[in-house]
């Protein structure tokens, strides 16, 4: 006798809400960075003209945001796959045909859909490893702490494509 539903069912609003909150935070970072001055040096013309070298170009805010989004949407895919499994798995789907097959045993039904979801999520989990922590000095050491934000953005794009497929399943 089932006393409680699995976390993937009971905690869906909390996890989906946390993912939404993470993505809203990321959107805020992207908006802030899109409106910021990132040139180096910054040139301030006028009576009190000034040329200031600084670090506003550093990609840490974007890199952290890409990593955060990657982790959040990967987890969204993970909890989604758990619900796919609960629907298809004859051991836990409360009497539905195995893999929702018309003729269980002779037909594999939607079994491959769950396998595809699991494979996509596994790749997302690998890709969700933060890029921002992987700084490697460049430019003869002058750029000794780089954000690796482009790597994070490229990985995030691939993760989002995989997550879209999982959600489609």
Describe the function of each predicted region:
Residues 1-78, 94:
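Accessory "access/gating" subregions that flank catalytic or transport cores
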């Amino acid at each position: 006798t089932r006393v409680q539903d699995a976390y993937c069912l009971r905690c869906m609003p909390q996890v989906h809400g946390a993912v939404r909150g993470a993505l809203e935070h990321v959107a805020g970072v992207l908006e802030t960075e899109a409106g910021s001055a990132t040139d180096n040096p910054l040139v301030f013309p006028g009576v009190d003209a000034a040329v200031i070298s600084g670090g506003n170009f550093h990609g840490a805010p974007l890199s952290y945001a890409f990593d955060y989004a990657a982790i959040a949407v990967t987890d969204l895919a993970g909890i989604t796959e758990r619900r796919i499994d609960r629907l298809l798995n004859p051991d836990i789907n409360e009497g539905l045909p195995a893999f929702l097959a018309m003729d269980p045993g002779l037909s594999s039904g939607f079994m491959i859909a769950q396998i595809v979801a699991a494979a996509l999520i596994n790749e997302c989990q690998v890709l969700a490893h933060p890029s921002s922590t992987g700084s490697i000095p460049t430019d003869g050491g002058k750029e000794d702490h780089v954000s690796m934000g482009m790597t994070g953005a490229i990985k995030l794009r691939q993760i989002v494509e995989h997550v879209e497929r999982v959600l489609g399943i």
